[in-house]
Regions:
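A conserved beta-strand element that flanks and buttresses the S-adenosyl-L-methionine
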Residues: 101
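Class I (Rossmann-like) S-adenosyl-L-methionine-dependent methyltransferase catalytic domain
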Residues: 1-91, 109-116, 120, 130-200
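Hydrophobic adenine-recognition pocket in adenosine-nucleotide-binding enzymes
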Residues: 105
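Short acidic/histidine-rich motifs immediately flanking catalytic phosphotransfer sites
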Residues: 96
Length: 200
């Protein structure tokens, strides 16, 4: 594990690194959804719990395999968090979620694990529920965004067409759009937002 990876495993360091981009990342979710209608949220790979602030008036459960992140999240946000593997997590039908968020995680795992994870998340959705995925798109070579992508901890950034193929194979697309993350007037990362319901 590199020094950067070791540092970002620390909840405080990770939270500070993400802080400038939290609002930008989440903006498409707010633009396309009436958050007052959300009932029960599952925040997959929730990290140190930053997303929980978006769901203060809903039922919320954050799940992450990193126990240090979960301990930090419980202490800081006083919401429900569990250390578990979302690929195998199960709930009773009455405890399913109408809003499942996967924010900036899938580019950390290979395609087999992405499919396994998303396949399981389908079983955790209510009949009217949707999955909401925010993730990095592999930028064109030679750009600042590509340099930052190559330096990222996640080694599985994918072109947009690959994301489309994965998502549409498991969910009915409702929204799929790309957007930039910017800083100092520059496009630093390219992102995709996908909203989908489970295929019947």
């Amino acid at each position: 594990m590199s020094l950067t990876e070791t540092l970002l495993e620390q909840p405080v360091v990770y939270r500070l690194w993400q802080a400038p981009f939290v609002a930008q990342k989440f903006a498409p979710v707010l633009a396309h959804n009436n958050m007052s209608r959300v009932n029960r949220v599952l925040d997959v790979a929730c990290g140190p719990g930053t997303n929980s602030r978006q769901f203060e008036h809903t039922g919320y459960l954050g799940i992450d395999i990193n126990e240090s992140y979960i301990k930090s999240a419980r202490k800081r946000y006083r919401r429900d968090f569990i250390a578990a593997d979302a690929r195998t997590y199960r709930v009773a039908p009455e405890n399913r979620f109408d809003f499942i968020l996967v924010n900036s995680f899938l580019h950390h795992i290979d395609t087999g694990d992405v499919v396994a994870l998303l396949s399981n998340l389908r079983t955790l959705l209510t009949e009217d529920g949707c999955v909401h995925i925010l993730d990095h798109v592999l930028p064109a070579p030679g750009s600042i965004a590509r340099f930052l992508a190559d330096a990222d901890r996640g080694k599985f950034m994918r072109p947009l067409e690959d994301w489309k193929s994965i998502f549409s194979g498991l969910f009915h697309p409702i929204v799929l759009e790309t957007y930039p993350l910017t800083g100092a007037g520059m496009r630093l990362w390219e992102m995709v937002y996908f909203k989908g319901s489970a295929l019947k």
